[in-house]
A protein has these predicted regions:
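Positively charged, low-complexity terminal tracts
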Residues: 2-275
Length: 275
């Protein structure tokens, strides 16, 4: 009988993280799909707003995503992809719309076609037994993060809030076959990894972000990401319950944004169980 992973063992985001490995044939090609194991306490979402694809999470998710990107730069098996499957996805924290699965692509060894992306999406969530586990090696990431922090000019960081965000020039973000993708060669993946891993270091009002292939992509994190997701779920339910007909998404979203703000306000002032 296959045992469940121990929570403390499955959720530590460190070098040599244990991940699942599956071999799939998609669009006539062999792929090695590396994914998170059940028990990993990390949550993500995606959305597309103002022409930009966003990966959304919290501080913890940024650390994990950074480690996944860094380790991917060292993979050598053609057809390797990293998948963040549906069980780790939330509705987005703004209007509660469903998230796309997230795939990380090392472009020097893997080509993800739209047909392969659609074939993979149709098979999600991947519930069949994994072919095995891998230890995700991230050599040099901690040193690279420490070096970035040592030379980071904190006084210059606030300029991000009045101009286009800085980020990584080499990695590319987009949507392929219904999957949100971040793709790049090894140098681009490592650069993106450090930029993502350090999100939260210079947060402004509980939020931080970094561009990936600006203006096409961005990773954005919130300190209260999970509370925002919860509020967006409630807001979407409340707004839809009060409508006789569902409006166009462009008209519906502002209603949910406004209601979500109200829900978060209610949650903050709600009395505790012993009040």
């Amino acid at each position: 009988m296959r045992g469940r992973p121990r929570p403390h063992a499955a959720t530590r985001i460190v070098d040599r993280l244990k991940l699942h490995r599956r071999r799939l044939r998609l669009d006539g090609r062999e792929y090695t799909i590396v994914g998170l194991r059940p028990g990993m306490d990390a949550r993500f979402s995606t959305n597309h707003f103002h022409g930009t694809w966003h990966v959304l999470s919290d501080w913890r998710g940024a650390r994990l995503l950074g480690r996944l990107l860094w380790g991917l730069a060292y993979q050598r098996i053609p057809g390797t992809l990293v998948l963040i499957d549906r069980m780790f996805l939330d509705p987005n924290p703004f209007d509660g719309e469903p998230a796309d699965p997230i795939v990380l692509v090392p472009v020097r060894i893997t080509a993800l076609t739209a047909q392969a992306g659609r074939a993979l999406r149709r098979r999600l969530p991947l519930e069949e037994t994994a072919d095995g586990t891998v230890r995700w090696h991230t050599p040099g990431l901690d040193a690279a993060v420490a070096a970035w922090r040592a030379k980071s000019d904190r006084s210059a960081r606030p300029c991000l809030w009045s101009s286009a965000p800085s980020g990584t020039a080499g990695a590319r973000a987009g949507r392929v076959g219904g999957l949100m993708t971040i793709a790049g060669d090894p140098d681009a993946l490592r650069e993106a990894a450090v930029s993502v891993h350090t999100l939260g270091d210079h947060a402004h009002e509980g939020m931080d972000y970094t561009a990936i292939d600006w203006p096409n992509g961005e990773v954005q994190v919130f300190r209260d990401y999970r509370q925002r997701v919860s509020a967006a779920r409630v807001a979407r339910q409340e707004v839809l319950a009060g409508l006789t007909a569902v409006p166009h998404p462009d008209d519906l979203r502002p209603l949910i944004w406004h209601r979500s703000t109200e829900v978060r306000r209610r949650q903050r002032v709600a009395p505790g169980p012993h009040s």
